[in-house]
UniProtKB/Swiss-Prot annotation:
Pathway per the UniProt entry: Carbohydrate degradation; glycolysis; pyruvate from D-glyceraldehyde 3-phosphate: step 4/5
Catalytic activity annotation: (2R)-2-phosphoglycerate = phosphoenolpyruvate + H2O
Cofactor (UniProt): Mg(2+)
Compartments where found: Cytoplasm; Secreted; Cell surface
Keyword Transmembrane on entry: no
UniProt-recorded name of the protein: Enolase
Primary subcellular site in the record, as a coarse category: cytoplasm
Cofactor binding mode and count: Binds a second Mg(2+) ion via substrate during catalysis.
Lineage: Bacteria, Pseudomonadati, Pseudomonadota, Alphaproteobacteria, Rhodobacterales
Family: Belongs to the enolase family.
Any one Gene Ontology cellular component term annotated for this protein: cell surface
UniProt KW keywords: Cytoplasm, Glycolysis, Lyase, Magnesium, Metal-binding, Secreted
Example of a GO MF term: phosphopyruvate hydratase activity
Length: 425
């Protein structure tokens, strides 16, 4: 009943208006799973390959018809007839079929679309929600959201070097309340920015992209918004940063052009330490560049006991990169992006490896998203306790928050909100 009888991919558009891959997988009993693949703006050099056509006459070279053809041709030919409940075997077949270390032949966007659609079809056939099918009976922890309310870097057209400024409603009693708290701060921040004569247009992930002068300027606005919304910074709501520092690491220096700073790796660590001393920062993502292992080690030795240090470009959801980081004592948290590695199986392997090393995991969206809310289910399935899925604007972001609210309702009295259990030190 769970044999795959049809696999069909199409080219659709993501939240930035760029093409992406969507896949439908149909099973023998008539059930169907559908998955759409996200894409990033700031991408790590070690990520699996997102296959683009390169035809400048079509979507400015960003079309994905080759990836679609790979799904409808080679992948479908090899997977039709396979049992959709055998996720590990199916993912392994696609990895072997591709035959490259970074999924560059068929494309990680082709392989991931099939991998996730297979899981969703199998869950439907088993009459289970996706979080339960993937996570089993123990899947019940609702994650604390990292809500990106001010954008900089590659996600906005302003002089702020750091890419994301986020709030984390750790004192909420449940996900529904966490979303409410975040929404109230978001709308209060909009009023504060408007009153200061600053723009309130939003960036790729729904956060505001005002023309602020510095990192501290952005943090001060957020603190004021938290307080005016009736909450206590550092108690009710914590702060988080995504530096995306690989984007401004040039010639061995951290070139923060917006602030006119040129910092050595040691000076960059001191800069971040000073921010953590002055603001209630719970988490810093990509505080050092993806191949600055010495900088990462210094950052971890300096702040790792009290701050969550998340590797995104550093680890790219890749078990091999993560193992190297664990061995070197770099970072203490894994950012989980399914399209960085390209299959559900490898994603879950990375989360398990992080857990064994006592690293936390943060389930994450990409800046180019769709209405697909799979990562909400995966956050609960893995009990990872944290999710990063943008601001309280744009339906591509809210789809994930709304799905978490639904999952909490389904879990009923067994649901647990991670809350302050994620705090370090």
């Amino acid at each position: 009943m769970t044999a795959i009888i049809d696999i069909f991919a199409r080219e659709i558009l993501d939240s930035r208006g760029n093409p992406t891959v969507e896949v439908d997988v149909t099973l023998e009993d008539g059930t169907m799973g559908r998955a759409a693949v996200p894409s990033g703006a700031s991408t790590g050099a070690h990520e699996a390959v997102e296959k683009r056509d390169g035809d400048k006459a079509r979507y400015l070279g960003k079309g994905v018809l080759e990836a679609v053809a790979a799904v409808n041709g080679e992948i479908a030919e090899n997977l039709i007839g396979e049992d959709a409940t055998e996720q590990v075997a199916i993912d392994r077949m696609m990895i072997e079929l591709d035959g490259t270390p970074n999924k560059g032949r068929l494309g990680a966007n082709a392989i991931l679309g099939v991998s996730l659609a297979v899981a969703k079809a199998a869950a439907e056939a088993c009459s289970q929600p996706l979080y339960r099918y993937v996570g089993g009976a123990g899947a019940r922890v609702l994650p604390v959201p990292m809500m990106n309310i001010i954008n900089g870097g590659e996600h906005a057209d302003n002089p702020i070097d750091i890419q994301e400024f986020m709030i984390m409603p750790v004192a909420a009693e449940n996900i529904r309340e966490a979303v409410r708290m975040g929404s109230e701060v978001f709308h209060t921040l909009k009023k504060e920015l408007s009153s200061a004569g600053l723009a309130t247009g939003v960036g790729d992930e729904g956060g505001f992209a005002p023309n602020l002068s510095s990192t501290r300027d952005a943090l001060d606005f957020i603190l004021k918004a938290i307080e005016k919304a009736g909450y206590q910074p550092g108690d009710d709501i914590m702060l988080a940063l995504d530096c995306a520092s690989t984007e401004y690491f040039k010639g061995g220096k951290y070139e923060m052009a917006g602030e006119g700073k040129s910092l050595s790796p040691a000076e960059n660590v001191a800069y971040l330490e000073a921010l953590c001393n002055d603001y209630p920062i719970l988490s810093i993502e990509d505080g050092c560049a993806e191949d600055d292992w010495d900088g990462w080690k210094l950052l971890t030795d300096t702040l790792g006991g009290r701050v969550q240090l998340v590797g995104d470009d550093l680890f790219v959801t890749n078990p091999a990169r993560l193992a190297e980081g664990i061995a070197k004592g770099c970072g203490n948290s894994l950012l989980v992006k399914v399209n960085q590695i390209g299959t559900l199986t490898e994603t879950l392997d990375a989360v398990r490896m992080a857990d064994r090393a006592r690293y936390t995991s943060v389930m994450s969206h990409r800046s180019g998203e769709t209405e697909d809310a799979t990562i909400a289910d995966l956050a609960v399935a893995t009990n990872c306790g944290q999710i990063k899925t943008g601001s309280l604007a744009r339906s591509d972001r809210l789809a994930k928050y709304n799905q978490l609210i639904r999952i909490e309702e389904m879990l009923g009295a067994t649901a647990e909100y991670a809350g302050k259990s994620i705090l370090r030190g």
